[in-house]
């Protein structure tokens, strides 16, 4: 379909619609600003103002003040080299003749650099993926930077550090989700100091991406810079993203010309400016940070256990614990295996204790004397092969576990771990270790800062990518706050501090196995410095003289041991497991994170002692005491080994399936993640109650740029507390058969793991859950006091919840290192209706306020002591997850009570009532008995909103959304429904045939159907389908106008409501403005709708009339013989506009009426459903009345069309035959007959008016009565305060709208009924038009569906075909031919009775009753036949032979023929004749012999169906397209039709653009030029109607000139010499002789004399060919031709003897004028007229 609006009109319409939408939005905002505020609930602290600063370690960027890169800013910094060199360095290079010129290379904008990209909102998975897709889609990779743009790190707040091109940064700034973009300053990459203490130490450079050629290129450039400083730089590749750099002097020792400080500054400033560098930091020096200790680790808060297999049944069996340290003395009995040697750099799982021992180029395969590593391994898992020896009592904690060891030192040298820590952890992980112990680390050269380094990020990264691995690291032994080892600040590790051991240890094991000699050596140096005479004292001398000189006791080992024992004896409260070791490093980290996480025993820990690289067995016979095999050491290193061993045992507990029953169950075998192990360890820790408590932050001096927070249940000294495994690690055995909820000391405990509700999920199915930004999940547990325990003393109920997640690695240069922020909140609902929230910070809060959440740590915990039965709800929320989704582990435990998983999470407290946010109003929710909120019940609505009793919500009657709902929604649903319905009908019909191939150029598709087929909706849709877009726009505009109109009464009612309380007219300002705007909208859109629909109406009637006219002129000849021209013109002129008005009006009326009806219906039911039901009680009655009305209307409309057609027919016949009317003086008779017809029209129209008026009056009376009832009942409801007076007024106005729309919709049905009569007549013509079939298969389908057969079959809608007359020379009886009023179609609609018999006009006057019966009979005939006789459409073959040239040879072979209108009469019988080119042939015979029929068959006016073929140039004309055939054939009839046009136009009619020369030449050949020249205007003379200004002979010569001008090979002449004077006959005869040259001429004549000169004459008689030959040959035969010739000759002689004029002369004066009118009459009835036939038949394609 085509859209027929110009672009200007479309722009105008679009602009107006856009204007209305903008106004709607503004109104919505205006009204929303006046609406009441409703309660808002906070979600994840969104009510706090977001901090949008970018927090880097070296800089804080305020993005509100610092300008962002804009999309119109491109700064090109061209440089030949990949390296961007600062001005000072560029100057140095220039001084060293190293040219670096700016070439203005446009590729500079494609060079990558670091940018900070801040998002407008919190980063989630979607926005992060959008950034990734943008970087991939817009990336350009250069040869000098062979890596892709990508996200490097997350930086708080809401930012990413991104490596991308400058062009990408500019493009990215236009994204709506980006708020700020800035270049990453090189100074933010540098994190090192330049002083004598640190100078010369290696510096590590973290790269953003790997590059192979980087080192050599950088070294060359930097060494050229350092020449003038007499220094060099050495770069070493650590891994693909890490370099080590050392700056050194060229000389062996520093000289005045070598300044390392200045050299380093230049080097690292230059490196920081390179796009590949990401982070630069100084290398740090690494340092190293039990028979009684297990009793503490597996004890409880107040009770210790025995170090045996009863109280500690699990010892890490099946687990591999990895340790990296100074070395391991493999010959020690704790580690040696009599069967296997220690596996060096290989894996042997069969070794009793050590499965692998990994060494590097900087380490060996042993430990130094008293080595740190051997002691750590012994504390963790060492045990002798023979467990019966006494020394086994000093075995490690996880004695059944095996060790994977990584040696970090060689001999007595310091630790040198791999620069890439992944190279340390990966081989241990591959060996099967899942728990790792690191009791070493480094402290920043800048002091105690708790900094986060690249090593720290590397540890976090390894744990993030290996989620089932956990690392435990020593906090350090530096005793101050912020003194944590750098690697221990990693977020994902378990950082372990040290607390003291049990009091017994200070009296026995510790004093016995401490290496006092190291202390003596140190103290003796101090004494020597004090007094030189003591420098050479031995320990014996110190002991001997200690009484005299007190200070000498410090170099006496015996006295040192005694001092330890004495201190423990005298101060038992200071020396026990409840105190922190004074040396243990304390938190927080530099960004305020809480470290350590846990503490474990770390003072005087006795374990394996290394004797260095020897093969002796230090254990001896295993007896005690054994100082060669055992050593007591203090430090967080020792604590870490115990914590790692405990974690290993915990992992065994889960992996072997002990949880939760305490016995091994196969389905309970759980594969824990590192975060789960960490969460369980922290969750079951106990805060120490000793003398070392957390000092308040007010008394501590912290660096000014640090942030510190307090946490409930944790401290910066001991983290979440000391490890106490027996709090929940429950194992059932023969000696200790405790149940799951009871430990050995009787404390009941329940442990729950998030996502592992044992009623629903088995442990072996467990996996971590994950969250993204904005998501949350909840875990709920119930608590009831235990019947077997009291809430006093140590039995106080307690719940602890812990949340842990493995956070992605942070950028080391960020101020805060948390990337993904999850938040844990505990909610419980009390019986008194209050709701209490707990979080990791700030304790509890009430009354719906969200608690303060932790934004720093990836560990959150909540501790609570319940006092009453309750249900806990723990909610984990993804507050900010830029690198999501984030996996997490949640652990809950409850003790001293009965705990279990809740069936469902509670939402409220019993009896609690809460204001709930409802749309556009305020509601309340009640807490039900199951602690769930009920649905929100609306209490009140905001201003400009009202409660919708149907939808049960507050609706805003004028808002942008509401307008869209009514207009857009209503329009689309309505139009889509109608179109789908019609398309469905169309689809059903298309299964039979695809009708769209019947388009004839008008854009209207009409599928041929049977003559009795009803007009369907699909048929009607085909008529309006070309205009559907315009109609849709018009309908949409009308709907907008309607929507605006139905909104006005509501505001009118509001004004009335507010009048009593209004104090000033200005109070109604907004309502008046809204009503005015609505009125303007209604006016504008109704005008547009009317304008478009008016144009569509005219377009449609034009196209429909064109379509009908095309269908008429494409009909076969029989159609015009059977139908009256007046009736056909009435269909063309009257029915098509009526049908058009009905169709376009129906669509528009349905749309607007339905919209107004539905819209008003919404309002009236919203205002009062009771009044609405009162109204709708009468709708069925109104529908019934309308149905009765439509039935009468349908019949009366058909009758009206019948009488209108008769009046038109009579009027046209009178005008055409005016000569006859005047000649016989019958004017009065015709006036009376026409008046009778008009009277019938008037009477029918009056009855139709009475019918409609009566129905309308009844409906009006019912509506008015209903209005009275509604007003009465509405007033009653208003008095009862059920609604206001204003709403009553609005309701009444809307009722008017409903009535109006109902009337419109009922009227649509009436209009549809009225259109059926017109539609039936129009579609009868449209469906009968000949059409072409495209394929042979389609022809077969048409025949099967009853549509086949070709044109000419008499399958019209007459009841009887036998009496259909054909008026022509072939009419056998010729009845009526002498009647001057005869239209040569005597079998018209009006004079055929029901039986098909002819009726004659009765001369006798009829009575009124008889006249009435006759009218009813005529009406019945009309209703049955519709006034139109239709021959079934001709189905044209699917393919033709196209002629490009024609010789003019024609041959009839056995041709027989019957006219379609008279199938019972055979006109031709087995005709055989041949016409050759260049010759003239004559056809003679009496009237009705078939002469003219032969000419019509040559022109293919009728198809042959009774046998035979007509061959032209050896081609059957049935296979030649009709128009193609007629392009070589021209026919001149006896009574030629001339158009009311100039002579030039009449002669050149057959040509598209004839020249005057061609016209004159044709006129000369036709001997018409002479008389044309004598006319006043010559060839421009207008001939009048049917050529009335010319005589008969002149008209025939003009017709012959037209045929000559057509330049066609075959000339058919039908009686062209009849009724002419001798002069005209002679001129025409000469013309024929001219035409014969090069043409095939066939003449038909009654007079044989007219054809005597023809080359051959064919004689026909009663349809048979009786003779053929030349004139002489036929005369000699004395046959039919001879008799006809002699009869004519005798008649001519008789007339001459009598002195009377011949027939030609007589007719020349009188008949020619009559012929003008008769010709016109005959042409209207299509009586074989040459020119009319050429036009009427048209192109049958």
Swiss-Prot record:
It is found in: Membrane. It holds the Pfam family ABC_tran. Residues 297-729 form the Peptidase S8 domain. SMART domains: AAA. ATP binds at residues 1485-1492. The chain crosses the membrane at residues 962-982, 1027-1047, 1072-1092, 1157-1177, 1260-1280, 1288-1308. GO terms for cellular component: membrane; plasma membrane. The active site is at 325 (charge relay system), 372 (charge relay system), 637 (charge relay system). The keyword Protease applies. Residues 1031-1314 form the ABC transmembrane type-1 domain. Its EC number is 3.4.21.-. It is a multi-pass membrane protein. Glycans are attached at residues 390, 536, 547, 614, 689, 735, 741, 776, 832, 887, 1251, 1385-1386, 1454, 1704. Residues 1697-1734 have a biased composition (Low complexity). CDD domains: ABC_6TM_TAP_ABCB8_10_like, Peptidases_S8_Kp43_protease. GO terms for biological process: cell differentiation; protein processing; transmembrane transport. Keywords: ATP-binding, Glycoprotein, Hydrolase, Membrane, Nucleotide-binding, Protease, Serine protease, Signal, Transmembrane, Transmembrane helix, Transport. It comes from the Eukaryota. Residues 1450-1687 form the ABC transporter domain. Residues 1334-1403, 1697-1741 are annotated as: Disordered. May be directly involved in maturation and export of SDF-2. The exposure of the protease domain of tagC on the surface of the prestalk cells were it can convert acbA to SDF-2 is induced by GABA. Intercellular communication via tagC may mediate integration of cellular differentiation with morphogenesis. In the C-terminal section; belongs to the ABC transporter superfamily. ABCB family. Multidrug resistance exporter (TC 3.A.1.201) subfamily. This is Serine protease/ABC transporter B family protein tagC. It comes from Dictyostelium discoideum.
